[in-house]
């Protein structure tokens, strides 16, 4: 979603990217294939990096890592070693594939280190760098405070929770989404919730009349 992407760059005070792959929605295979072709073109014809750093567990993470590995470009993975144990999740497959071909496994936590060791990754490739989500929060905490978001919702003197949903496995199936929404409604009786609705989630909520 272009609008959401622009908002994220602005909120995090990030510069415009030098390259935009221009890959939108589609099936997992379509996304991975299009990303691989677009990124390979950059590496071969525009700018070949000395090191590719990929983040997280999305399709572009695994796709770009595969391109780099096949072009003999070193790859580092931020958030390496995170596991859900559920191979029905597309993100879990992306994690496993990416970590299997990376040269540097940059982990957020001790459990991630152990997951990688249990999978046979050598200690020399595992480097704990910490949780980048917490880094982001620390860098932006003053900006967050300046937004006075609790006051906007009348919550400055109350406990509250913030909710967002975006994983396809949670929002694309009407039964699963209804179960989650019922749980949120129930919990909202105990604590007020602010629901930051992702475009994909909004579409499903409207489609399923939830």
Segments the model singles out, each with a brief description of its role:
Residues 74, 125, 192-193:
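Residues at the starts of beta-strands that form the adenosine-phosphate
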Residues 6-8, 14, 145-210:
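Donor-nucleotide binding loops and adjacent catalytic segments primarily
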Residues 2-3, 22, 101-176:
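A nucleotide-sugar donor-handling region in carbohydrate enzymes
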Residues 1, 81, 111, 199-200:
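Residues in the short beta-alpha loop(s) of Rossmann-like NAD(P)-binding domains
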Residues 8, 20-122:
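Active-site and donor-binding regions of nucleotide-sugar-utilizing enzymes
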Residues 87-91, 139-140, 207-208:
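Short secondary-structure transition/capping segments
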Residues 59, 82, 133, 168-169, ...:
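Short, glycine/serine-rich, charged loops/turns that create anion-binding
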């Amino acid at each position: 979603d272009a609008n959401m992407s622009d908002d994220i760059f602005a909120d995090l005070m990030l510069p415009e990217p030098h390259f935009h792959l221009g890959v939108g929605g589609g099936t997992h295979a379509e996304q991975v294939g299009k990303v691989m072709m677009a990124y390979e073109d950059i590496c071969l014809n525009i700018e070949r990096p000395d090191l590719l750093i990929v983040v997280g567990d999305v399709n572009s993470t695994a796709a770009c890592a595969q391109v780099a590995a096949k072009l003999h470009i070193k790859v580092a993975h931020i958030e390496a070693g995170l596991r859900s144990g559920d191979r029905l999740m597309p993100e879990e497959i992306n994690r496993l594939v990416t970590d299997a071909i990376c040269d540097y496994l940059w982990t957020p936590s001790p459990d991630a280190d152990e997951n990688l060791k249990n999978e046979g990754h050598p200690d020399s490739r595992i480097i704990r760098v910490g949780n980048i989500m917490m880094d982001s929060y620390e860098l932006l905490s003053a900006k967050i405070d300046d937004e006075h978001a609790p006051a906007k919702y009348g919550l400055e003197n109350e406990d509250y929770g913030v909710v967002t949903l975006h994983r396809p496995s949670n929002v694309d199936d009407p039964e699963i989404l209804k179960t989650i929404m019922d749980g949120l409604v129930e919990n909202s009786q105990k604590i007020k919730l602010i629901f930051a609705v992702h475009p994909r989630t909004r579409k499903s909520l409207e489609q399923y009349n939830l």
